[in-house]
Structure formats: C-alpha cells, structure tokens
Amino acid sequence: PIKSSAASDVYKRQPWRTVTVGETLKPIVETTVPWDVVEPRYTTTHDYKPGRGTWSWILWQDGSINYDDQVRYVDLAAAMGYEYVLIDNWWDNNIGRDRMEQFIKYARSKGVEVFLWYSSSGYWNDIEQSPVNRMDNSIARKQEMRWLQSLGVKGIKVDFFGGDKQETLRLYEEILSDADDHGLMVIFHGCTLPRGWERMYPNYVGSEAVLASENLVFSQHFCDNEAFNATLHPFIRNAVGCM
C-alpha cells in the first residue's frame, strides 16, 4: 500500500508487475503468479459450474443465430455430454426475446444450460451487433440480469470493450459483481487480459484476449499460421491468465 498525498489520507495500491523466469519453459506454463498476488473481491452464495459448450458462430457465423439452428446445437451439446450452449450476437432480433423462454425450456429438457451474448456498449462502441445498451448502464444492466435470472440463463458473454482505460476496467468489475448478484457466470470477449480474475471473481469464466481461432473465419493468413500460433499461446497468453 502507498499512502496518498490527498487530504483524505486514503491508502492506494499500485498494480503488480511480475516476471516469471525458469531454466525451461515448464515454470512459464505452470506459473501461478497472476493469482498469487491478488485477493478475492467478493464471496458468492452461488454454486457456479463452468463446463463445455457448443457454439454455432465459430462454424456458421451470424446466419446460424436463429431458433432452428440453435436447437441443433442444443441437441449436439446433449449428444456430446456438454453442459452448455452459447448463443452469439443478434439473438434478440433473430430468435427474439419472447421466444427465449421457450428455447431455454427446450435446452433444459435436454440437460443443457444457456449462455447469451451481449455488447458491452458505451459511447466508445459503434458496433451494429445486438443486444446493445444493456451492460454499460447500472440500471439497465440490473434489469436485464433480473430477466435473465428469471428465465434460467446461466451466463453471459460480453463483447467489444473499449481499451484499458479506467472507466472500461471498472465496467468489467461492475458487470461481474452485478452478474453474481443474479447467479450469472461471465465470459469476456474482445477484451483486456485477465489478471488473476479467476481468483478475484467467483463467477468469472474466461476471456478471449488473444488473436486466435475466431480469425480463421476472416483471413487465409490466419489459417496458414494457426498451427504455429497455437503452439505459442500456452507460453505467451496462458502464462498471464486462462482463456
């Protein structure tokens, strides 16, 4: 802790800077330093169970976000013994909020739980993909999360964050904290590196924060380099925090 010069005599903390070294790559892969230097930010009354899931977007992109294709991916998850299905952007338009209760009942009848995608929104964010304007305002966010909880949704994937400025970093924690109040797990995408968040936030599941397989959809260059890039991730990305 560093004593502040402010009149309020508040104690502030500087962020950790860590270095992991070893004679081989083993300690780089196995390091726990990012988790060792943080403390849990809150406790939870919920029993969160991260697991495996199907995700249509990685194969069929936006065109797959419709009721019938998502039913197919629920059936696939059930056949594979997976716990979840993740429905990506545009579900509010292409499936509809009114049909989501029906869809979740079907998924649960197959033993599959549901994650839904959201834009982080905010004034910095001009993307078209929806739902938008549900996560960056505390009142709208809590209303939306109450609705999700009432339907039995188990988690959310929040995407397209605006850099690493303080306002955005606060938004991550506010989303996580409010989600915990409503029994929701959280995945971040298009986001900053996690820094010990698995220990800090009990409902945090994972973050993308890497130029990875999503880009195989967009460019042959990424396809040509996928095998090489995949061998780097354990040493340069997962050493900082889990995906």
PLM regions with names:
Residues 12-84:
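An acidic-aromatic substrate-binding cleft motif
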Residues 89-243:
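Aromatic- and carboxylate-enriched substrate-binding clefts and catalytic-loop regions
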Residues 4, 23-24, 119:
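Short, solvent-exposed coil/turn linker segments
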Residues 1-7, 11:
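Single conserved hydrophobic/aromatic residue that forms the stacking wall/gate
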